[in-house]
């Protein structure tokens, strides 16, 4: 169950982040709402990640710690990306970092879980 919550929350974070970036020029109020909803999903990701960490550590404790750090970095990059967008600063660098870090984090997550919940 925690795997599904974790996966759905990560998908929601990615979708909300991309939507917020695209919608900013049209509505700052909607952008702020999406940013706040994103933060609720951070809490879900952190809680579900804590519940699943014991299974990841059994697989490989070094990769589990690295995945935890990558997850924290993803949340930080999303916050920086959205705050730079709100301040109308260039976001290209953070967008590239976001894509790279998300791909690495997702790959590690599926490796450590043996493909669960998507490939079981």
Swiss-Prot record:
Localization recorded for this chain is: Cell membrane
GO cellular component assignments: plasma membrane
* Membrane topology summary: Multi-pass membrane protein
Query: Which InterPro entries does this UniProt record tie to the protein?
Result: UPF0344
Its transmembrane ranges are 3-23, 33-53, 62-82, 92-112
Q: Per its UniProt entry, which superkingdom is the organism in?
A: Bacteria
Cite the entry's keywords alphabetically.
Cell membrane, Membrane, Transmembrane, Transmembrane helix
Q: Which family does it belong to?
A: Belongs to the UPF0344 family.
Q: What is this protein called?
A: UPF0344 protein LMHCC_0278
